[in-house]
Amino acid sequence: MQGFFEGLELPVDRDWMVVGRGRGADLLITEPTISRAHAAIGFDGEEFFVEDLGSTNGTAVNGKRKPRTALNTGDEIQLGKLRLRVTLPSVR
């Protein structure tokens, strides 16, 4: 994350985690360009992904907007004006 949250690590500790500014979000971020339920970050048993949940300002990975995108270490997720850098766990 950039700004106040820069360097903060947020583990995805469940299969489906909603990111948004609404009370029901698992990761609550009070940024005006983020929708109440903006996107979900999760794991489907095969890959980590981010999925837009019909947000107003969209969700992009590495500058490309798609409804759902598989994630890799080093990817940049953009939710409104917020940018997140992806670091995936090592597979042993």
Could you tell me what each predicted segment is?
Residues 1, 46-51:
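Short, well-ordered strand-loop elements centered on a beta-strand within folded domains, enriched
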Residues 1-30, 42, 82, 92:
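Intrinsically disordered, low-complexity acidic Ser/Thr-rich regulatory segments
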Residues 2, 32-34, 69-70:
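Short solvent-exposed loop/turn micro-motifs enriched in small/polar/acidic residues
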Residues 14, 22-24, 34-36, 45-46, ...:
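A generic structural motif
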Residues 30-32, 51:
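Surface-exposed loop and edge beta-strand positions of immunoglobulin-like domains
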Residues 49, 54, 60-92:
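C-terminal boundary/linker segments immediately following FHA domains
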